[in-house]
Amino acid sequence: MESFTLSKNGYRLDTEFKNVPVAFVNGLRRILLSEIPTVVIRDVQILDNSTKMIHEMLKHRVEMLPINVRPEEAAVIRDTKIELRYLPPATPDLTRKSAVDITSDDFAIDGPRPGIILKDRDLDEPLYFMRLQPTESIHVKASLGVETKGTSQVCVATFKNHIDPELAKLDKDTYVAPAGDDDNERAMLAKVFDNYEIQRSYARDDEGRPYWFDFALESIGVTPAKDLLKQAATIFKKKIETWCENPIQREEGDWYSIETEEEGHTIGALAQILIYNQKVNFVSYRIVHPLLPKMIVRFSSKIAPEKVIEKFKTEAVALCESILKSV
């Protein structure tokens, strides 16, 4: 991991990863998107809903509100209760004169501390929730919980191949050469190259594969970006170590496989490329079926399979530890 820069009060991190396989960077991205422990709204009870929004959508919208509580704040998570109650006013016709825009500030918080629903980080304004028409009412209760799968604390987690400036210059000269001495045509082709074709001029290793990546991470505001990257690397390391403990199944003719119902593409793709680099006869991974939680890594090698897996573990863990040391 190269040096990194922080912005937006520490909630955005930009860095570069060098001499790593694309599967490793993508694995980090996948963990950041859906495997970081996150405090969420759960146990939603809809006691009254006369709006046009169906119950399922209302429940989903409540659960999507970002919570300004960290997973380690056990007391806050346990004792906080959330309620939204908006009934028609006690007027003779039980109607309002105009519609009402409900925001996150309209949720009543009963717990150890207020302000647990995040505001818009950039505008410092409450989040828009829904519009309530004059004759409509709503009453919702909920609590907090911690989820480790399928939730996210980031609004940006992405990477791209790093552009090799020397290669880009050569490619650009080649791209604009057909224009000859026509300055207008050269300028147009140069603009096209800078806006699009330059993406092909990425840094490559000796085997022509990308090895240098620009990585961007932005937190929605609960946990700083630097801490999120550290958590992702820690989780990745643990997943690697756990996967390597699975039994190796032996087949005929120096064929071996490892099956797991706990992991998928994150570990499978990384195992495939790092084992491939050991010059084995064959290696692949596959997800048995999209609806079945099973991933199989299969390889053929004259080398003892235990040594192959141990080398994979050493290299993969070293990649994670390089991040932990850098941040």
Segments predicted by a language model, with ranges:
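Protein-protein interaction/assembly regions in multi-subunit complexes
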Residues: 1-327
